[in-house]
Amino acid sequence: MGMTDVELEQHDKLNAIIETLNKDKTGNIVLIGDIMLDCYIHGYANNLNSRAPVPVLRETHREEDVGAAAHVARGLQSMGYRGKIFGAVGDDKAGAKILEYLEDEGVNTTGIAIIEDRITTVKTRMLASRESLVQGEQLLLRWDVEEDEPIPEMALEAIYDLSLIHI
C-alpha cells in the first residue's frame, strides 16, 4: 500500500527541508523563543492514597533536559549547524542548569538574557507504571512552574535587537 496524497506531499516537503539544510551548514541559524527546563520523574504507582483516590508515586529516577527553543538549538548543534539562541531565563537554579547544559554541548548562549527576580519556566512530568509490569509507563501529572508576567519590554527589545545583528 502506498502513501496517500497528503502523506506524499508531507514527505516531499520534509525531503525539501532536509535538502535545503544539507546544502549549506556554514550559515548561521538564529532561534528566538521560549527557553525552559523539562524534568521527568519516573516511578511506580502500585497504591492509591488513603485520603483521595489518586496514585502514590514511588520515585525511581529523575531526568532533566532543556526544552522548547533550547532543545531545538541543541539539536541543530548536534547536526553540525551553527545556531544562536535568543531568549530569557530567570536568575535561578533552573536558568543556570539550562545554560550549563547548553554550554556543555557547545551551544552559544550569549543571546540568552538572565533576568533578575524572574522564575525560569520548568515543566515537570510525573510518569508511572506498575512495578509488576515490564512496560506501560503513563503520564500521571504535568506540573508547570512559570512566570505569570511577560518578559519586560526593555529585555525583549534588547533580545530582538541583538538577534537582528546575527541574521
Model-derived regions, located:
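Short, glycine/serine-rich, charged loops/turns that create anion-binding
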Residues: 36, 90, 131
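Conserved small/polar residues in nucleotide/adenosyl-binding loops
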Residues: 165-167
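A glycine-rich beta-to-alpha transition motif near the start of alpha/beta enzyme domains, typified by
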Residues: 89-105
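Conserved phosphate-binding/catalytic loop of the ribokinase/pfkB sugar-kinase fold
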Residues: 114-118, 123-163
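A structural signal for isolated positions on well-ordered beta-strands in alpha/beta enzyme cores
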Residues: 30, 84-88, 111, 125
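Glycine-rich phosphate/adenosyl-contacting loop at the front of the ribokinase-like
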Residues: 2-84
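A glycine-rich helix N-cap at a beta->alpha junction
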Residues: 101, 105-117
